[in-house]
Amino acid sequence: MGEIEQRPTPGSRLGAPENSGISTLERGQKPPPTPSGKLVSIKIQMLDDTQEAFEVPQRAPGKVLLDAVCNHLNLVEGDYFGLEFPDHKKITVWLDLLKPIVKQIRRPKHVVVKFVVKFFPPDHTQLQEELTRYLFALQVKQDLAQGRLTCNDTSAALLISHIVQSEIGDFDEALDREHLAKNKYIPQQDALEDKIVEFHHNHIGQTPAESDFQLLEIARRLEMYGIRLHPAKDREGTKINLAVANTGILVFQGFTKINAFNWAKVRKLSFKRKRFLIKLRPDANSAYQDTLEFLMASRDFCKSFWKICVEHHAFFRLFEEPKPKPKPVLFSRGSSFRFSGRTQKQVLDYVKEGGHKKVQFERKHSKIHSIRSLASQPTELNSEVLEQSQQSTSLTFGEGAESPGGQSCRRGKEPKVSAGEPGSHPSPAPRRSPAGNKQADGAASAPTEEEEEVVKDRTQQSKPQPPQPSTGSLTGSPHLSELSVNSQGGVAPANVTLSPNLSPDTKQASPLISPLLNDQACPRTDDEDEGRRKRFPTDKAYFIAKEVSTTERTYLKDLEVITSWFQSTVSKEDAMPEALKSLIFPNFEPLHKFHTNFLKEIEQRLALWEGRSNAQIRDYQRIGDVMLKNIQGMKHLAAHLWKHSEALEALENGIKSSRRLENFCRDFELQKVCYLPLNTFLLRPLHRLMHYKQVLERLCKHHPPSHADFRDCRAALAEITEMVAQLHGTMIKMENFQKLHELKKDLIGIDNLVVPGREFIRLGSLSKLSGKGLQQRMFFLFNDVLLYTSRGLTASNQFKVHGQLPLYGMTIEESEDEWGVPHCLTLRGQRQSIIVAASSRSEMEKWVEDIQMAIDLAEKSSSPAPEFLASSPPDNKSPDEATAADQESEDDLSASRTSLERQAPHRGNTMVHVCWHRNTSVSMVDFSIAVENQLSGNLLRKFKNSNGWQKLWVVFTNFCLFFYKSHQDNHPLASLPLLGYSLTIPSESENIQKDYVFKLHFKSHVYYFRAESEYTFERWMEVIRSATSSASRPHVLSHKESLVY
């Protein structure tokens, strides 16, 4: 007999030394005794598509086979991987590590078991070994080829360019094209070849280890990274897909994520036959706990997905492997399953404690010609990449950050992201190539816990720019880098922003909410730097003038949303009638030009004020003359200002009459640059006049009459007061008009919300008492009707109207004693009565006062029976069905209660959603006050558990803080809605030891912000208090309110 030829092991093929006995067991533990008996040969397909045969005892548990594979590879972090195979019913399942192999793989000779990544951590820098990252990179390559990792063309080309750099080394066009012709990394690769080659040219000098690092940096930001879809249906029979990730359970429609249930919200997971059940924890103000139900293809499919969910929860959320429960002696009921293996925390601790030897290895593609690979050893590069990633100056913001929760970047529907978005700035790369190419720049957007930051869930249509040179090394930080897919998954090669990652204990939020919260790797401002900082004048007038400058910068950016971004998009799409174009853009462009010059004058004056010792003599320490000159110039633009209300009405009428224009405007609002509702930007010029008036009032109050600047300030104040008085009535009318149209986008099930004479009064969250107990509902109060709605599992994130109570003839009474529910009210209408409960006494009093006022107004009106709001045309309801809809159906309000077929993408972070998550309310009075309280400027930010301060450009508007890396950025990186937050000054026990610091906290979330002067500190406190106290401020009927109502 001839000798059997020895096949190379995976470890030797990769160039690893002989097996050093590395095990996935904790130190001090012994492996279970290997069962004796017949050996069975099992074929394992590795991530590089080669196959290896392993002989294991037939009765051995699955863990023996997985350990054998990991030992063969000398893989220390084997816990992230698993073995999957098709069972006897052709369902792909994971090998159970506790069950005997023979009971799982019935016919080993005919089955190929795949060694693949099972648990995808939120941050690739948590993978300590270069070999582990290499295997993850192979998994990404495989997912791209199989169509699992969907993304836009730019992202795909950038990913493939890093794969090519890892496989063949530095750029050579002929070699690149030859290699791409022989290797297909993605379907329709030919169309991307030029872009791949172009990106590859930017990676010169990048080693394979760095290429893997950058590949994972980009891939982890894509929404479909690590996602395995499991087909299911909701209760209505709508086809959806379920998936599980490190953050919780996700719901997709196609490749679009439409909902997420983070582990913190899930109380219990179970299945019953084909039904998969998620029992959610009850809200703080609701005794009723919701149970979501999904229907899967079979019991086996359902059980398989249930086991995957249990394993993900244990691996990412538990500190140690759960202990086995004793088996019942006589009877057992239902299925039981226990996670076996180390948790992620145990793996991280084991590797950090040095319980292993770092293994050098060679890759499958070893013949590469990278410049730096000739000069550096792989281990040195690896450690340097990690060190640089940990020192990254990328912006981060928050605790419990979560991955983007918007739509996936699927081909054909994603926005095109150009290489080189204007206004962005490069951030430090882990390494720089000899050519000195700049690193791809970035930003952040992401969604958190339901009471965390809200980040715009939208995409960006960037302006076309020439490609910027790039090393391709996106910031390899485990924190928020400067790059963004902003919950849409698309990654641009340069000057684009990517979303933040998750920490191991990160909690996912609803599609609305999202974060930027991580304390590590933030740029720091220490005391030494503070000592070298520029010293500003101490005069309060200087800081008032500086406020004009900082807010003017924001105002110009807001104008550019219309004059630049919206106009350029309109010209490309040709979706707007010429008459509407001529009404909007010619009335905004003169304002932008005028205020650009105005800002230059202010900044020149401030520069002289700051920098000259003889400024007092040369008459530079004043701003009144500049204000007076430019306000007089603004009076010549009054004709354009008068046209803005007409433009707003024309735009909304055009949207109502044209489906194409409606879709176009909705798509534009999903772009990152449009960080507020589009129609809000049309009212910005009117709001800006009030800000000038406030600033001048403060200057006049500050200066004594004898001051040289007093006369100019007083004259400018008189001029601007006259303009505000002329436009005040129009502004009040337009604010209500704009708010009605904004609410219309958040609601489904109504059609004629915007009618002449209807005034918005209050919106907010209340609990409605029904047969199932108290259930959270969203209420909308107008001057003629009260609507109540619920938010379902919809792709659009809108609220469905379930009831309408005309205010005419309504009575309201407190009924705490009758129902035994705190802060309870009974609303008795002529056709229907409902019982509701507020979250607090103050919240109940505000609702009572506003509803009673609205009832009184309705009684005085000449229309005792206002027309009910009609159902929207898409609902296609008959009159009988419409009447039935008024009586709320409990089945209709269940988890998967609405069809997902015809829902359009919708912003999920509006004020309605914030009130829903924070369980509070806001009134039109609050909105009017918020218009007057807008502020911009630099602040230093610190977390409660950190020592360093991070400098951010912060814009406060619309009850929300928007965070930018600098004032030159075109869109915010993240935002923090302030409703529900408390504003205080840190106590001595918090050991801040800095001046001008204020504290924002909500539940467990605490942020410290530091201003540069006493004046700016007081101003930030003033404007933020207007938002944080809006939920608790006693209701006072202002002059504005009386005009509105």
Swiss-Prot record:
Residues 759-856, 932-1029 form the PH domain. GO terms for molecular function: cytoskeletal protein binding; guanyl-nucleotide exchange factor activity; small GTPase binding. Changing R714L: In a breast cancer sample; somatic mutation. It is found in: Cell membrane; Synapse; Synapse, Synaptosome; Cytoplasm, Cytosol. Residues 373-396, 471-489, 496-511 have a biased composition (Polar residues). Pfam families: FA, FERM_C, FERM_M, FERM_N, PH, RhoGEF. Keywords: Cell membrane, Cell projection, Cytoplasm, Developmental protein, Guanine-nucleotide releasing factor, Membrane, Phosphoprotein, Repeat, Synapse, Synaptosome. GO terms for cellular component: cytoplasmic side of plasma membrane; cytoskeleton; cytosol; dendrite; dendritic spine; extrinsic component of postsynaptic membrane; filopodium; glutamatergic synapse. Detected in cAMP-treated chondrocytes, but not in untreated chondrocytes. Detected in fetal brain, heart and spleen, and in adult testis, kidney and lung. InterPro entries: Band_41_domain, DBL_dom_sf, DH_dom, Ez/rad/moesin-like, FA, FARP1/FARP2/FRMD7_FERM_C, FERM/acyl-CoA-bd_prot_sf, FERM_2. Intramolecular interaction between the DH domain and the PH domains can stabilize the protein in an autoinhibited conformation. PANTHER family: FERM DOMAIN CONTAINING PROTEIN, FERM, ARHGEF AND PLECKSTRIN DOMAIN-CONTAINING PROTEIN 1. This is FERM, ARHGEF and pleckstrin domain-containing protein 1. The lineage of its organism: Eukaryota, Metazoa, Chordata, Craniata, Vertebrata.
